[in-house]
Structure formats: C-alpha cells, structure tokens
C-alpha cells in the first residue's frame, strides 16, 4: 500500500466505526515509517510501522479510500478498494441521498428508511422495471424480482428470493412488495386471463394482513416484527400464468403468547379484536380492554403510535373473507382467541406444596364456555399430572409454578394449532392439489421471509433455533457466491487460484450432528425427570474439549449457560426453559378434554392437527440410546427435531432453485427517518454476510471492465500515436482493441498478476482501479495545465495591450481631475472648520444649560423633602391633639346623647297630639263634603283605609312607648340625682300625654264604627252611586269647571292629610324604634322613617287596590295553596323558578301601588313559610328540597336591589324616597333571612350526608385505608356528582354554586380537625400520610369546579403535615412553627401529645418541644385542647357578595293554576 502525502484513507473510530482522514506526513528514518493523519473531526493521529504490506500485524494502519467517482456506486463490487469502511461509506452516502437500495454483487442491500416512500412501489415503478435487465436501472427490489421472473421464464428453472435481516430492518415489507410485483406480472393479453389474475393477485396479497395479524408483534426493535419464518411459493404454469400459491411456516414464537417483555406486545390479532369487534359480540365473548388481561398487559402501553386497531381489524377480516373464511368461521376463531385471553386470567391458589383451582373460578368458566369444554376436567389437569407406568397410572399434584406452566402450555398449544390450521386453510384456497396431477404447475418462485440473526442479553431456545437457521442460510450463501465467482472465471477462461473463505460447518455440526446439541436436547427432553441443569452438564462434558471447543465454550461463572461461536458473533444462551420449550406438549388429560369439545371450529382445528401428525412421518433414529426405554422413542418428535427437519427441507428446496438475495439493514435503533448509525450498520453487515461476500470477492478479481469501457476510460494513459487511430475507428477488429488494452496495461501496471484478460472483460485485483484512476487523474491534470497555460497566455497578452491603451487615455483625465479635486477639497475643508466651530459652541452652551437645570431640580427636590418632613411632623402633632380632644370629649358627648334622647321622646308625644287634632278637623270637613256629594264616596273610602293604617301605626307606637319607658327606667338608676329629677319631670309630662293618646284611641274607635256604617250605606246606595258615576263620566266629557275644581280640591286636601300624618307619626315612631334597637345616634344623623303606605292616587286602579288590600286572601293562597304544595321531585327546567316568580309578581304590584305595609307583611309570611318548609324537610329530601328553595329564595334580594335601582334612576318625590327606603330594608332583611335559612340547612344537610356516606370515617378511619377505601370514595364521589347535578338542575347561579362548595369544605375542615384530635386514639406519620392522601383525593374532585380549594381545608391539611414531618429537636420545630399559621399552639400541642411512634425504632416527640408549647400556651392564655367550634355566623360568609346577577331569569312564565287571586292581580296590574 502507498501512503503518500495527500492520500485519502479511513481510520478506526470508536463512535463512528470509521472516520475519513488524509495523510499529512510520511517520513522514513531508522527503518521505521512515521505517518501523520489529520482526521475529519480535526484530530491528528501519529502512526509508526515497519511495513505497509501486512495489515494483520499492524491493525492500527489506515485503510485506503476510493476515489470520489466510485464512492456512491450502485454496486459495491465495483469499488476499487473493497474494504469495510468503503462498503459502509458507499451505503451511507446512497442512503443519505434517498437511495435505500445498493447492489453487492448478487446481493441487494436494502436500508430501512423508516419513512413513507410509496413512490418507490407504485404501479408505474412496477412497469418501469418490468422486462428490464438488472443493471439497466437503479438498484431496486423490483429489479431482483424481475431477474428471478426472467430466469424462470427463459431458463425454465425454479427461483427463490431470500429476504433476511434483523428485526425492524424491513423484511416483511420487502417480501410484501415482491409478492405484489409477482402477482402483478401478466404475460397473457386475453381478458379471461386478466380476470383470473386479478382474483389470484387479491388472494395472494390478502395473505399478508392475515399472517401479520396472527404472526407479527411489537418488539423493542420493531413495531411489526415477524415472529415466525415464512416461505411463500407462487406457482406458474407453462404460459407463466399464476396458478396458485403455497405457504410454509417455520418456528412460530409460542412463548410470546404468554409472556411479553416491557414495551413489547402480544400478537396483533388480540388487540385488533379487543378494539374492532362490535360491542354486542364483545359482550358475548366477555371482552373488555387489553389492560384487563394477563396475556396483553405485561408489556405496558398496549397502543402503537399511528396504528388504528379497529381499522386493522377490518383489513384482517376482509382478508379472511377473501381467502374463503366466512363470517361464522371468523367468529369461531375470535371465540377461541377470547378463550385464550380468559385462560391467561385464571387464578390459582397456592398452598405450601400444591396448587388448587376451583372449577367455579370465573375466568375458567368463561374460557371453557367459549372453547366448549368441561370446566371440571380442564381445571383438574391444570393442577395435576399423570405418570403412566407399565402397570398403572399415577396422578400427582403440581406445585404453583408447575401449574402456571401447565396453564400457559395449554394456551400455547391452542394458539399454535390455530395458526397451523389457518395456514392450511389459506393453502387450500390458494392452491388446488389437482393442479399437480394435471401438470398445470410448471415452475414456481419462492419468497423466504425469515428471521435474522438475533443476539440479546438473555438468549433462549427461540434464539438458538433462529441462529441455527441463519448458520445454514449463511453456509448456502457463501457456497453460492463462491460458485458464481468460479463460473465467471471459467467462462472468461482466465487463470485463477482457489479462494479460501470462512466455513461455518463446525458450528453447524455442533448443532445438528447425531451427538450434537439438538440430539442431546431431544434425549434429555424424552426423560421424565429431564431438566435444564442436567442437559447443561451433558453439554459441558460432551463439547468443552477439542475439537468442538473451537465453537463451543463454557462461561467463566455459572452452570446454566453455554456459548456458541456463530459466524457473526459469539452468543451466550441460558439453558432455562430449553427442555420445556423443546417438549412443546400438553398433558394427555387436556388432550382428552379438548377432544370432547362442542365448539365446531375448535374441533376442526384439533382434527387438522391429527391430520398433520398422520401426514408427517416419524423421525427414525436408529442410533441406540443407553438407559432409554424403547417406548420413549416412539413418542411424538420434539420441537427441535421438527425444526431441524423442516429446515433441512427448506435448504433442499433452496438448493434446487436459483437463489436471489436481499439483505435488509436497520440503519438506527430509534426508528428515526433517514438517520444512519455506523456502528449498528457495521454489525448487521457482518451478521448478514455482506462483508464476507466482499472478502471472497477481494480474494479473486473483484473489479471487471469490458474492453470498450476500458478503452474509453483509460486511452489517455498511452501516447497519442497509439490511440489516435483506434479511438475514432468504429470498424476496428476485436484483436486490435485487445492489443491496445494490453498496451495500456503494460504502460501502467508492472505486475501482470494484478490483472487478467478474459474473453470479454479485463479482471483486476483489489485496488487496481483506484491506481488507474489516480494515473488518469494525473494525466488529465497535466493536459489541463498545458491547455490552461496556452489559453491564459493569449488572454493576458490581449488584456495587456488593451490596458496600456486605456492607461494613456485615462492619465490626462485623471491629472485634470486631481487638480479639481484638490481645489474642491481645500474649499470644503475651510467650510467644515467654520461649521465645526459653530456646532461645538452650540453643544457646549446646551450642555451648560442642561447641567444648570439638573442642579436646580436637585436643589428643589432636597428642599421639598425637608419641607415635607417638617409638615408631616406638624400634622402628627395636630393628629395627636385631635385624638386627645376626642377622647376627652367622649364623656360629655355621652351625657349629651342621654339628654337628647329624652327630649326626642317628649317631642314625639307633642307631635302626636298636634297630628290628632289636625286629623279631627280634616275628617269633619271630609264627612261634610261626602254628605253633600254622594258621588265622592270612593274618595271617602280611601280615607277610611288610611285610618286603618293609622290605627296600626298608633298601636305600634303605643308598644314602642311602653318599651322605651321601661328602658328609661332602667337607665335612670345610672344617672346622677340632679339629672334624674329632670328625667322624672319629663316622664311625668309624658305620662300625661299618654293618657291623652288613650282618649284619642277611643275617638279613633268611634271613627271605625262610623266607617262600618258608611260601608252599609254604600251597599244600600250602590245603584245611586252607579248612576252618579255615569253622570260624572258625561260631565267629565263636557268638562264643567265647577265640579272638576271641587273634585281636585278634595283630592288635594286628602293628600295633604296623608302627608301630615305620615310625616308626624313616621318621625315619632322611627325615633322610638331607633332608640330601642340602636340607642341614640350622633347629632345630625338621618332618622330612619317609619314604614307607611304611599298610595298614588293618580295611577291607582280601584279594583286592583281592593284586591291588594285583602292581604289575608292572597297571602294564604300563596303560602298554603301553592308554596306548601310544591312537589320538588316533579320540578323540571321550565318551572324551577315558579315560586319566586309568584312572590316577586305580588310584591312588585304592592310596591308599585304604594302598599308597603301589605308588602312587608306578605314577605314576612312567605319567608316564614319557606323557612318552615326547609326546616321540616325529611332527611331523604334535604338536598333536593333545600337547594330548590334556596335557588328561589336567593333571587329575592336581587329582585329588591333591581327595583331599588329602577326607583333611584327615576328620581321622584317623597313617596319614591319612602319606597327606596323600604326596598333597601327589604333587600337587607331578606339577605339576613336567607343567610339564616342557608346556614341552618347546610348544617342539617352536612350532618345527614356525613351519616349517610360516612365522610369522616372514610377520611380518618385507619381500618378503611387497607380495606374498602376505594369503594367508599367511589360512593362519596357519586354523592358529590349527584349534589353538583342537583345544583345545576335547579339553576343555582355560579357564584352561589361556588359558595355552597366552599362552605361545604369549611364544614368538612372543622369536623375532620375536631374528630382528628378527639376521636383518634393515637397518631403517627403513617396515619398522617394516609389521611393526607385521602384529603388529596377529596381536593382532586373539587379543584376542577372551584378555585382555592386548599384554603378551605387549611387546618386539617396543616394537621396531617405536622404528623408527617420528622422533628428531632426544638430548633427544627421553631423553624417550622411559623408555617403552621392556621393552628394555634394549643391545637399543635393536642396533635403532638397524641403522636405515637409507628415503628419500634422510631423516636417520639421530644419533651423539649412539648415544654416549649406549654410555655407558649401559658404565656398567651390559650385554652386546651384547642378544639375549633362550628360557628356558622363566623365560618360562613354572607350571601350578599354572591347574589349579584341579572334578575331576568325570575320573570319567566310560571304556572299560576289554583292561584285565582294572584292571577287576577297579575291581570289587573298589566292593565
């Protein structure tokens, strides 16, 4: 090898495998070569060696790199330097350019793109490669398929396409597209043939989804990994028309059915039926989801990204229908698969030595029902085994682990039998045996999709068989490649020597010899007491010695492993499970149970197994076994022997056909699109034999060129006189071309052993093409240099002449320009200096002004600060003086208020007397006018109604006076003697006034009697009044001025009477009432007026007023006839707010007509009624009834506020102001009543709910933590969801909704905390952890519905956090003490006193902490034990902040059926 400076080469790299580099130094002194390489990553490597020829002695020497023209070649055998890095780089370069296929001689290397490349397999691509030679187009698997098809057509020989590679490399997809290509090839042009071809194509392609569903699974390396080998034969007749197809399968991975490692899955079909079956069928088969079954939930995540299992199920069932399996048979298959899932869920009980299984076990019953077998016998043979001797049958019990193995063996037996039956049914559909008898099948093309070499951390029986199959295929591949090389050399008649290549025959002999691994495994499997350990010891004694120890070895540690040196890598196998997997059998008892099945599909499957056993001849083993009875050799063959036999048959088929190879490569383990992992690809190239093929090619003549190609490429390497007459003469004979090629070779290559000239080609040893390319490049460089020299000389001569001419013309122009430029520069310089002077002066002046301004601002700020400090001190002094004056004047103001209260009482009495006298005078005038004008009887009636209200006010005033007198008498004892005498004098005068008031009361009673007489008179003269009213209407139409003026004056007088009485009596009564309730206020404070009617004469309706005055009528109708008869359970969305609509309608009418007294009494009666209804609700209706009435009652304050807003907007006279005062009182009073009803109901409801669902026991009871906690919480969450639904149903507004939830949590917080410190005998950190976990579950339900859940539970949360914290000393406790802000020291002490260590080794609460808490409590005078009381007035906020919403919702139409008076009021009010 030559390593001149500048030579490109490859150097080993730990992360990339190989990295490119360039020789930057090559020195030789003292017999040693000193090389220096600069790698592509910038690193420099120094190498010292004595020779460049022997690479084995110098493993660190770099490897020469191919010229760039050859690096992305589509055939690796054309590389000049055929070495490992050259092959890897060529594949990588093509892959990164989107070219996933590369030839390596007869092998097609296919790199998985992990991306959608559907354009590579379209119908147009199939047509492009049809009838084309392999080397005409880019590498493609269609080219391999076309080559196989053409070989079959022209050479009349059977073909085989071997697709191999590791899991995830794309074998299954490649095989699928090859099948599609063969199924799409059509030679016949007749219409009948096209129809038949379409049907066959569909059936052949339909086998793919079926085989993938039942034989593929998700693994860590591949989402769709084939877990079995498959050999598909597409059969052709003499006219190359597809006549059918046959499928052979090899070694289905049965263990995957019962065990899947993490992140892996069971076979796809189980997940497809669980997602795709209709719900009625799933219920019939008792199926739910993959996580519910042991056979599908071991791998974790059951879903595959981007895969719709329901859609895959549809594809699978359609494919089954296409190959002749009807819907009923499919349902039978799914029933068997469902039975397998239920078998995996069978649970056995474990005793000390045995396992037991009841025939009543639920999963057992379901599985036996689906399979149509007897549950008793099936359960029996799961936990028992039968040993047959010459004289008797012995039944023994199995231990728990053996019973599990027996259960899983049954499942594996059923699934493998189902898989074989499915393959046989597909073959019956795709292939008619009569075709062979009628000689219709002329040839076939086989597609072998088989597992690649596998090497995991733990390798078992499946990996052993897979690697054994790959050893056989690799041996056949090497022999095939060597055979092709020999044929090429013989055909070209060149001299060649025998090529040595690594033969893996010793490894194959180790496995399959008569005393090989498989034979010893079969021998041990046939022994009843055979075990994995015994078999391992036999392997060590048989093979751990020469010559077998070259391919077999024993690990340094352990007695349960052995190592086999395969062609790819040494693999360490675990012997555990080999014997059981090799036996692959179920008990005779289970077979007898299965034979009695009533499931027709299951019976067909078992019958098919018997036919397979009858058709397969038993393996004849003539070798005499020592210590093995003859009867044992007559048992059924083991799985290993069957696999060995089927593999031998497969190799026989392959050897009888012309083989084409496709090696699939997995470029990265993460399955990322278009990413290339060098180390991973290198390991696969070694494992699949590509590098071995290249080594065989390198041993011969890997590079070959035809004579014409060689001449066209390298003619430049000879003298012009030799190639000028040959290159342009197309009729030149072959001998002249060959002689010219010999001339080129003689002139360039001195060693004739480096090449051979054949009949049509020239063959080169490895590296010769690179050498010729280097010579050609150097020659081309020399020629280019000569051409460039001549062209550049001509170019620069012309350029020089043109330049000189231009220079002469430009010099004169430039000189004149320079003068002008110099003058212009001097002028501009002078101007610039002047301009700079002015600008700099301006800058300096501005800078000076800015500095002065900033200094002034700073001075102002400082002065302002000093003045403000002085003013603040003065204000503080003034404030202190004011506070002192207020404190000193408090006593004097108290005396003043006492005197003022007495004077107001006297003034009230005087005003009452004056009002009474004024009323008598006005009453007499009204009576005289009523006698003169009978048609004015209506106005008199209104005055009488006003008397009624006045009497009521007088009675209330009398009561107030009595109470005030008592109050004054109690206060006199505290007044000094001088003041007491003054008070007694005032009281005596006031008593005189009282006596006068009593006289006034008697006179009012007389007036009432007169009123009754007037009513009687009204009834007698009704006809007269009617006629007068008609006359009045007529007179009104004519508008007589005299009568109109008289009526108007009468109305004005009546209004004046009402105003005077209202003002006098209102002021008096309100003062008395205010004194009674709140005491005397500050002087000048506004006095609240007394509630009176403010009837509006101008807008009143006599009929409506008469109805509204009859308070008892409609009050009883609403309360007794409507509210108490509401059935909450029958309330729907249309009449949820019916009660509040009725109430607000009546109140609105009363307020609008000025009947404030009637409105107040009506509201009081309604509120009392609702309160009694809520308080008397039975326990089972507490939630529904309470929420219904609270939802309605909460609208009443909002209604009052809305009405108040309307009156405030309208402004108005004194009557409107009185109405506003009433509405304000109505809003406040209804809020208080609502708060009272709400608080009482909430406590009652929570007590009932707590007793019903055991909330506090659920959270705090330690026994529930391990037993029925989940069930209890499910009950709690069901209750809370129902509670939430009821709130929504009865249209509780969002703000009130949130308040109810918050108050509920506050109640729970108080009760849980009190129960924690009173009912729990002992506390520890485990208990605190469990309580905290339960509280978190409670919080998780409330958090999506309200904000700030945790502050409502702060006490109980902090209490359990205290239990969970480990506090070892007082310093730690002091650091944490401030974080428990919601608890006082007494409460913390109560919790810590109850703390008991959970374990023996755990320390209790240090005494210094308890002593510290005791001192804090003593210092702050706190009471023990710190129990929090449920004070609803303090704990539950007022509803006032939660009832701000639009009242339009209460104006909905409600059913007023049965409310005659209310309906009439509504009707008249609307008029």
From Swiss-Prot:
Superkingdom of the source species: Eukaryota
Matches recorded under PROSITE patterns: DILUTE, IQ, MYOSIN_MOTOR, SH3_LIKE
Recorded GO CC terms: actin cytoskeleton; cellular bud; cellular bud tip; cytoplasm; filamentous actin; membrane; mitochondrion; myosin V complex
Binding-site residues, ATP: 165-172
Region annotation Actin-binding: where it falls in the sequence: 647-669
UniProt feature coiled coil, ranges: 938-1063
Knocked-out gene: effects: Abnormal localization of ASH1 protein to daughter cell, with protein mislocalized to mother and daughter. Decreases HO mRNA level.
Record-level Gene Ontology MF annotations: actin filament binding; ATP binding; calmodulin binding; microfilament motor activity
Limits of the Myosin N-terminal SH3-like domain: 4-57
Keyword Transport part of the UniProt annotation: yes
Alphabetized UniProt keyword annotations: Actin-binding, ATP-binding, Calmodulin-binding, Coiled coil, Motor protein, mRNA transport, Myosin, Nucleotide-binding, Repeat, Transport
Domain Dilute: 1164-1419
Sequence ranges assigned to domain IQ in this UniProt record: 781-801, 804-824, 829-849, 876-898, 899-928
GO BP terms: actin filament organization; endoplasmic reticulum inheritance; intracellular mRNA localization; mating type switching; mRNA transport; vesicle transport along actin filament
Recorded family membership: Belongs to the TRAFAC class myosin-kinesin ATPase superfamily. Myosin family.
Misc: Present with 2210 molecules/cell in log phase SD medium.
Assembly, per entry: Interacts with SHE2 and SHE3.
Its biological purpose: Part of the mRNA localization machinery that restricts accumulation of certain proteins to the bud and in the daughter cell. Recruited to specific mRNAs including the ASH1 mRNA, coding for a repressor of the HO endonuclease, via its interaction with SHE3.
Designated name of the protein: Myosin-4
Source species of the chain: Saccharomyces cerevisiae (strain ATCC 204508 / S288c)
């Amino acid at each position: 090898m030559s390593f001149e400076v500048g030579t490109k080469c490859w150097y080993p790299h730990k992360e990339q495998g190989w990295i490119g580099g360039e020789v930057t130094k090559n020195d030789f002194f003292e017999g040693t070569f000193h090389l220096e390489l600069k790698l592509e990553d910038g690193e420099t490597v120094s190498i010292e060696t004595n020779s460049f020829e022997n690479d084995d002695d110098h493993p660190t020497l770099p490897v020469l790199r191919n010229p760039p023209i050859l690096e992305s070649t589509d055939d690796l055998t054309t590389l000049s330097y055929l070495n490992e890095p050259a092959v890897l780089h060529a594949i990588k370069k093509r892959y990164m350019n989107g070219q996933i296929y590369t030839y390596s001689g007869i092998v097609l290397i296919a790199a998985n793109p992990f991306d959608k490349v559907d354009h590579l397999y379209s119908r147009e691509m199939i047509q492009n490669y049809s009838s084309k030679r392999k080397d005409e187009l880019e590498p493609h698997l269609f080219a391999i398929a076309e080559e196989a098809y053409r070989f079959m057509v022209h050479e009349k020989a059977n073909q085989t396409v071997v697709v191999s590679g590791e899991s995830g490399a794309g074998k299954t997809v490649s095989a699928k597209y090859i099948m599609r290509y063969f199924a799409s090839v059509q030679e016949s042009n007749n219409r009948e043939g096209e129809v038949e071809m379409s049907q066959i194509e569909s059936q052949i392609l339909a086998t793919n989804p079926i085989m993938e569903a039942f034989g593929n699974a998700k693994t860590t390396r591949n989402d769709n990994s084939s877990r079995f080998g498959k050999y598909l034969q597409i059969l052709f007749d003499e006219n190359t028309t597809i006549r059918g197809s046959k499928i052979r399968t090899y070694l289905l991975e049965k263990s995957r059915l019962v065990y899947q490692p993490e992140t892996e899955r069971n076979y796809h079909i189980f997940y497809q039926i669980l997602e795709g079956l209709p719900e009625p069928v799933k219920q019939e088969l008792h199926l739910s989801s993959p996580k519910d079954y042991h056979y599908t939930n071991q791998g974790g995540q059951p879903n595959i990204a981007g895969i719709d299992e329901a859609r895959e199920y549809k594809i699978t069932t359609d494919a089954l229908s296409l190959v002749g399996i009807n819907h009923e048979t499919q349902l039978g298959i799914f029933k068997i698969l469902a039975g397998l899932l239920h078998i995996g869920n069978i649970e056995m009980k474990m005793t000390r030595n045995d396992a037991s299984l009841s025939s009543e076990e639920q999963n057992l019953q379901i599985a036996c029902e689906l399979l149509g077998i007897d549950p008793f016998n099936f359960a029996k043979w799961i936990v028992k085994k039968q040993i047959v001797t010459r004289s008797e049958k012995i039944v023994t019990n199995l231990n728990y682990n053996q019973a599990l193995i027996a259960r899983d063996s049954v499942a594996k037996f059923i699934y493998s039998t189902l898989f074989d039956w499915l393959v046989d049914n597909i073959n019956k559909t795709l292939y008619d045996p009569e075709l062979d008898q009628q000689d219709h099948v002329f040839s076939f093309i086989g597609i072998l999709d088989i597992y690649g070499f596998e090497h995991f951390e733990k390798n078992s029986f499946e990996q052993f068989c897979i690697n054994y199959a790959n050893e056989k295929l690799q041996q056949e591949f090497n022999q095939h490649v060597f055979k092709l090389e020999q044929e090429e050399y013989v055909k070209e008649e060149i001299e060649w020597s025998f090529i040595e290549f690594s033969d893996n025959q010793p490894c194959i002999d180790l496995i399959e010899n008569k005393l090989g691994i498989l034979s010893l495994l079969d021998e041990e499997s046939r022994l009843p007491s055979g075990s994995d350990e015994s078999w391992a010891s036999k392997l060590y004694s048989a093979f751990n010695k020469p010559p077998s120890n070259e391919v077999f070895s024993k690990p340094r540690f352990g007695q349960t492993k052995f190592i086999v040196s395969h062609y790819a890598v040494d693999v360490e196998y675990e012997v555990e499970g080999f014997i059981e997997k090799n036996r692959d059998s179920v008990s005779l008892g289970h077979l007898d149970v299965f034979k009695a099945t009533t499931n027709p599909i299951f019976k067909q499957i078992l019958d098919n197994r018997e036919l397979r056993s009858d058709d397969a001849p038993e393996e004849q083993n003539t070798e005499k076994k020592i210590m093995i009875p003859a009867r044992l050799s007559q048992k059924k063959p083991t799985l290993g022997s069957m696999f060995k036999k089927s593999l031998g048959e497969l190799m026989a088929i392959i050897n009888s056909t012309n083989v084409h190879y496709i090696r699939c490569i997995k470029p990265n383990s993460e399955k990322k699109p278009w990413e290339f992992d060098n180390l991973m690809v290198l390991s696969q190239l070694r494992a699949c034999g590509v590098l071995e093929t290249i080594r065989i090619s390198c041993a011969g003549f890997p590079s070959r060129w035809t004579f014409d190609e060689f001449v066209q490429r390298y003619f430049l390497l000879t003298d012009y006189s030799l190639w000028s007459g040959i290159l342009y003469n197309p009729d030149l004979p072959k001998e002249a071309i060959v002689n010219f090629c010999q001339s080129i070779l003689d002139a360039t290559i001195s060693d004739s052993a480096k090449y051979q000239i054949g009949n049509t080609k020239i063959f080169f040893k490895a590296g010769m093409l690179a050498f010729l390319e280097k010579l050609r490049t150097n020659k081309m460089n020399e020629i280019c240099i000569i051409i460039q020299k001549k062209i550049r000389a001509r170019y620069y001569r012309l350029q020089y002449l043109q330049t000189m001419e231009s220079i002469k013309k430009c010099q004169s122009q430039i000189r004149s320009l320079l003068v002008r430029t110099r003058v212009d520069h001097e002028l501009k310089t002078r101007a610039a200096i002047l301009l700079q002077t002015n600008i700099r002066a301006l800058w300096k002046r501005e800078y000076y002004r800015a500095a002065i301004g900033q200094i002034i601002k700073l001075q102002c700020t400082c002065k302002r600060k000093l003045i403000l400090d002085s003013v603040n001190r003065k204000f503080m002094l003034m404030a202190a003086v004011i506070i002192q004056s207020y404190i000193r004047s408090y006593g004097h103001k108290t005396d003043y208020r006492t005197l003022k209260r007495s004077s107001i009482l006297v003034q009230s009495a005087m005003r009452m007397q004056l009002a009474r006298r004024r009323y008598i005078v006005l009453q007499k005038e009204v009576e005289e006018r009523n006698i003169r004008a009978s048609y004015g009887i209506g106005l008199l009636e209104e005055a009488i109604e006003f008397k009624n209200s006045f009497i009521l006010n007088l009675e209330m005033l009398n009561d107030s006076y009595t109470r005030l007198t008592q109050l004054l008498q109690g206060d006199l004892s505290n007044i000094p003697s001088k003041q007491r005498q003054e008070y007694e004098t005032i009281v005596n005068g006031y008593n005189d006034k009282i006596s006068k008031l009593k006289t006034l009361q008697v006179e009012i009673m007389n007036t009432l009697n007169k009123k009754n007489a007037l009513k009687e008179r009204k009834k007698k003269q009704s006809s007269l009044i009617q006629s007068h009213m008609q006359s009045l209407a007529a007179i009104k139409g004519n508008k007589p001025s005299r009568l109109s003026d008289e009526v108007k004056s009468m109305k004005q007088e009546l209004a004046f009477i009402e105003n005077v009485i209202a003002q006098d009596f209102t002021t008096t009564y309100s003062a008395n009432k205010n004194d009674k309730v709140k005491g005397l206020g500050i002087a000048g404070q506004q006095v609240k007026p007394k509630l009176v009617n403010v009837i509006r004469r101008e807008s009143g309706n006599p009929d409506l007023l008469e109805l509204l005055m009859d308070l008892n009528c409609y009050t009883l109708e609403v309360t007794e006839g409507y509210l108490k008869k509401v059935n909450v359970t029958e309330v729907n969305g249309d009449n949820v707010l019916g009660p509040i609509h009725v109430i607000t309608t009546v109140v609105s009418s009363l307020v609008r007509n000025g009947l404030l007294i009637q409105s107040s009494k009506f509201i009081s009666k309604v509120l009392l009624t609702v309160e009694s209804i809520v308080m008397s609700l039975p326990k089972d209706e507490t939630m529904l009834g309470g929420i219904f009435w609270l939802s309605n009652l909460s609208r009443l304050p909002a209604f009052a506020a809305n009405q108040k807003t309307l009156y405030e907007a309208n402004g108005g006279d004194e009557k409107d102001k009185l109405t506003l005062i009433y509405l304000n009182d109505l809003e406040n009073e209804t809020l208080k009543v609502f708060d009272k009803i709400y608080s009482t109901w909430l406590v009652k409801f929570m007590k009932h709910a707590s007793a019903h669902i055991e909330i506090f026991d659920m959270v705090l009871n330690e026994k529930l933590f391990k037993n029925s906690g989940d069930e209890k919480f499910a009950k709690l969450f069901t209750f809370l969801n129902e509670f939430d639904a009821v709130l929504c149903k009865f249209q509780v507004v969002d703000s009130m909704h949130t308040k109810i939830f918050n108050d509920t949590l506050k109640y729970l917080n108080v009760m849980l905390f009190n129960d924690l410190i009173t009912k729990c005998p002992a506390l520890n950190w485990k208990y605190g952890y469990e309580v905290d976990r339960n509280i978190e579950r409670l919080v998780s339900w409330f958090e999506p519905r309200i904000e700030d859940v945790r502050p409502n539970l702060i006490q109980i949360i902090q209490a359990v956090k205290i239990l969970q914290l480990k506090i070892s000393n007082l310093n730690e406790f002091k650091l944490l003490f401030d974080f428990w802000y919601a608890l006082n020291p007494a409460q913390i002490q109560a919790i810590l006193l109850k703390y008991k260590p959970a374990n023996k080794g755990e320390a209790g609460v240090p005494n210094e902490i308890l002593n510290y808490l005791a001192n804090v409590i003593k210092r702050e005078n706190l009471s023990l034990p710190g129990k929090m009381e449920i004070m609803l007035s303090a704990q539950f906020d007022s509803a006032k902040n939660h009832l701000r919403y639009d009242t339009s919702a209460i104006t909905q139409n409600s059913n007023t059926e049965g409310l005659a008076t209310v309906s009439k009021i509504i009707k008249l009010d609307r008029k």
